[in-house]
Amino acid sequence: MEKKTYSYDEAYNASLEYFKGDELAARVWVNKYAVKDSFGNIYEKSPEDMHWRIANEVARIEAKYPNALSSQELFDLLDHFKYIIPQGSPMTGIGNNYQIASLSNCFVIGLDGNADSYGAIIRIDEEQVQLMKRRGGVGHDLSHIRPKGSPVKNSALTSTGLVPFMERYSNSTREVAQDGRRGALMLTVSIKHPDSEAFIDAKMTEGKVTGANVSVKLDDAFMQAAIEGKPYTQQYPIDSANPMVAKDIDASALWKKIVHNAWKSAEPGVLFWDTIIRESVPDCYADLGFRTVSTNPCGEIPLCPYDSCRLLAINLYSYVVNPFTPEAYFDFELFKKHVALAQRIMDDIIDLELEKIERIFEKIDSDPESMEVKGTERHLWEKIYRKSGLGRRTGVGITAEGDMLAAMGLRYGTEEATEFSEKVHKTIALEAYRSSVNMAKERGAFEIYDAEREKNNPFINRLKEADPELYEEMKKYGRRNIACLTIAPTGTTSLMTQTTSGIEPVFMPVYKRRRKVNPNDTNVHVDFVDETGDAFEEYVVFHHKFLTWMKVNGYDPDKRYTQEEIDELVAKSPYYKATSNDVDWLMKVKMQGRIQKWVDHSISVTINLPNNVSEDLVNQLYVEAWRSGCKGCTVYRDGSRAGVLLSTKKKDKKEEEECRCKPPQVVEVRPKVLEADVVRFQNNKEKWVAFVGLLDGRPYEIFTGLQDDEEGIVLPKSVTSGRIIKSYDEDGTKYYDFQFENKRGYKMTIEGLSEKFNKEYWNYAKLISGVLRWRMPIEQVIKLVSSLQLDSESINTWKNGVERALKKYVQDGTEAKGVKCPNCGHETLVYQEGCLICKTCGSSRCG
């Protein structure tokens, strides 16, 4: 039977009704989570369809085991994102037969044993790409690569060090599209590695390592030496008793560099590695393949090579009864029941993931390539399949911590609020582990469970002290899952739960947005006119749960409030002095450390700081994070991303301002030869290529065409730049050739670019080239291209490819005027490294 499909408008309008008029939540759901095929057909009308899809699939797995949950019971937990929310890949992929992809949100890879050869480095590169094409975020560690200058037995004679390979892995990430996005990558290195300083500095140079997050693994000895001003020994190999390279460094100086770079550019993040390993339950089985080596891209799941994790969030706000009233209380009994069910659902999702990997095997085996070509991907998924089934790792987390505290009448960041949060997370830990023990009775423990191995683990002993009976049950029956808990970022999840994100406080309870209006329309109130003459009306937006507080306390949400009245409202609410800008940052770090004691994996938190904070504050926050028992920490200083060095040449302020304000010169007569970049993109299922002609480093013209077809452009994949040459026939007809150097240094020419292109696309490309030639600002060209109303689906996807090709030329820090952040709704998007990054909430959108 043919499945019913829906138009975008049908799905959007149904979702808008589902989310009670929340446009942002509706668009996020339709764009990211509704089931679609590769032709863009939409098979789900609203999140209700999605929740039945997930409930039916999980119920199918439940039926294999005793005491099975029904589809209806599961649906009731998922409906309206009220209690339990599978995050990201599980939400998209469970029951979705239109894509062959993993359900895992994150992976870590890395070869066993001596893996510093060129072959090993390239193998990791290939594995990284294979995972990213199946929707996975990937992390891996570089501590195994020899430091720069080390002797090697090849024609180079000495090692290049790890920085060139950072760039390689970063570039691979940028190549891979996951549903229109770049891949996500975390690169880590031990501070003990002699090249760690170069690693820490790698992203401070313009355009370098733009496709990866970087974090440095800090041990306790380094932290102690940095604080006390003592020397610290770096060596390679980092764990060797007889290192081939060793040197003493000034720990304080390197620590200051870490702090400075984090203050300047928000990276590197820091991972307190001794804390991670000491607290890690899976590392009790390190000799059996569960030695933690790196983390996923957001840092909340430290993992061993070829292990993976799936994420789920419990909506804490939904357990507050009578929210925002003096009678408010937290329903711990219902909460305990649901935590147990969340752990159970996550175990079911592991079975669903193993089925998905079996489909990946079938796809690889049916591909026409030889096993020599596809063997790496097959072997990679075999290792992941084995490790996933062996440990059965889960990632049960939370969202809406900030709203939960406000609904209870507690102010985020106070001692009273932190104590309550600690109680909630202790409850999660005990009930998730109790559920895992009960599943061990019904379904069997994870294969290598051994109570003797875990007896000295601090996390396990915390559980033992809190609930001795649970510990004895675990010793007797084992546990279903090697590790259970995390706290991950919940960006789009919290948009759909309509709550605060993760364990974060509310960003702002009330803020203003602008919408464009026609000043000639009746009943229009014009509050603002921009420099182009466009008129805007300002309107107040209330955070969803602040709106609930208003209604509970008798304030009319439909009234038009003055700013003074809004300030008075906020001051009366539990959100007062509890926003991300108001919260005491040191107290927030201490809160993270206290909650971390009840989370067996890690917590992903970014401390958002105003632009004017000092480096000393960043130093204090990082040191406090280490002392408080946090496993990692990241800071983001407002505006710091745009503040990364744009070039290695220094300019004084006056020169910088002149450069920024001076418009590029219009050159009406095109030079005979222009330098050019090559940008590849997908147009539906076809591979296309764009040639972007550059004048003074700015796009001057663009040619696009089908790549590798019989009449199209045959161009080696290694070619990323060249020259576009304008010439004339004897009759005066002009034509354009593309010239590049091949790997052997010979000039190769592709003749007649304009003759190789479909005339329909050619005309649009001429239009775009025309506005580029007259030096319209690139961000405005992108806006123009985006606004083209085109009927053909192919033309529209081509248009999107052209937008992506041009975005890389927008100067970092340029505002995307009139464009709202899909995450927080603010018009605070700036271009950074070809991506749009929100200065308000830090979310990014690439491609």
Please annotate each region the language model reported.
Residues 218, 279, 284-286, 296, ...:
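Terminal amphipathic helices with adjacent charged low-complexity linkers/tails
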Residues 74-75, 235-237, 338-385, 389, ...:
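Internal maturation/activation junctions in enzymes
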Residues 471-473, 647-694:
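Short, Gly/Pro- and small/polar-rich lid/capping loops
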Residues 2-71, 154-168, 178-290, 321-326, ...:
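Conserved, charged catalytic cores of large soluble enzymes
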Residues 842-847:
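Short Cys/His-rich micro-motifs in 6-15 aa windows
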Residues 822-826, 840:
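Short, cysteine/histidine-rich loop/knuckle motifs that typically chelate Zn2+
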Residues 23, 299-301, 350-354, 460, ...:
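Catalytic alpha/beta core of large soluble enzyme barrels
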